[in-house]
Each structure stands twice: as C-alpha cells, then as structure tokens.
Amino acid sequence: MGKITELKALFANLSKDANKLAQRLALSSRSLKGLKDPRFRKAFNELKSAGLIKIEKSLETKPTPLFGEKLRREIRRHLISDKAHFSKNFYRFYFAFIAPKIEQISEFSDKDKEQFLSSLKLERFFCLPFELVCADFLSHKLGVLRSSISSYWDKDCEIDILVQSSSFCLAAEVKYKEHIVSKKLLNELVAKCEKIGIKPDFYALFSKSGFSGELINLAKKSPKLLLFELNDFKDIL
C-alpha cells in the first residue's frame, strides 16, 4: 500500500488529460499524428515539460514536385508524424500497466498481485526496450555515434533501426519473440529498403530466440548479412 501511495504522489500533479495521453502512448505505436485536439496538444506539452517524454523526429521527407508538376492529393495532405519516447522505461511501464488500475491495485491481496503480474503482456512491452538496446549495441559494435542511429517510418512502412554514418548504411529488424526468425524477415527488410529508395551496405537481424538454419547459412556466405542473438550482447554488459 505504501509503494502505491508513493507512485500516486510521483504523478499527482499531472492533469487527467496528461494521464490519459501517457497511457495511450505507453502501449501504442507512439505516433503523435493524432494530436490535433488542442486539449491533447496541451497534455503532450505537459508530459514533455515534466520530463516524462521526449520526441523522436521522423526521417521521412515529402517529395519535391518538379516544375509544373502537381503532387497527388493524398501526398499533399499527408502529415509527417514524429513519435514519443518515455524518458525512462519505468515511466512507460507505470502508464502501461499500473496507472489504468492503480485504485484496484491498492486494494490487492498478495495473491491478487501475483495474478495481476502474471497476466501482464510483457512481451509486447519489452519489444521497444529491446529495440533501443540493439541500437546501443550497434553504436558500440560499429563504432558510430548513437545519434546516427534511429528508426524509420512513413505512412507505408517502418524499419526498426537505420544506421546512416558517413561511410556506410545499415538497416536492421528486431524481433523479441519466443520463436526463431526465418528468411522471411530478411526478405521483408530488403523490400522495405527498396520501397523507400535506400541501398544499405549491410542488413542486420536481431532475435531473442535465434535464427533458422537457412538464415545462418546465408549469413556465413554473405558479409552483408549480420545476425545477432542475446549472447552477442555480453560485450556491452
């Protein structure tokens, strides 16, 4: 009960709208595209001022029309959307799982707490932290600035990690799943890169649960394909 009271006090100054928005961002795509309502823009600024969230800028750029050319209506109307990141994983965990049920949790017995914790869909929650750790790993492994690593998204596709240094480009996909990753993921990554018009020097795949034999054999033959599992992260621990 004491710890729940402490949590309530920690976020007591947040408005109802700010709490609602934080809960939405905690388990959503984190896109800020829908923040047209002045109330939610105010709530977003409140979360930002409180140091709870920060912005990841989109790498998407709008096409420049040629002289005399008129872009299609859907392209003209398309709004490039940034994304929100919680400044700490704890904040995201709190708003994803604790805040929506904080009043009930304060009355939980020990057994209720165990059942509540076992019911949480943590695999979905851990996808983003794992993706960020993979980006840190690549910064260390490749000797590039962390600021040169980001994710890419537009209205049609999303690439988990994109490294754009002065000497090379790398595109990567990250899977925090309980099953091995197959060549299908690589094919999808290659197709995404072709769609947005980039030609990476390297492709990287990260998997919590390993890779298919086909992918492993392919990586042995191609220096352009890099495969990373949990054991590879020992270097940065």
Tell what function each PLM region has.
Residues 2-154:
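Accessory nucleic acid-recognition modules appended to NTPase machines
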Residues 81-237:
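A cross-kingdom feature that marks ATP-driven nucleic-acid transaction machinery
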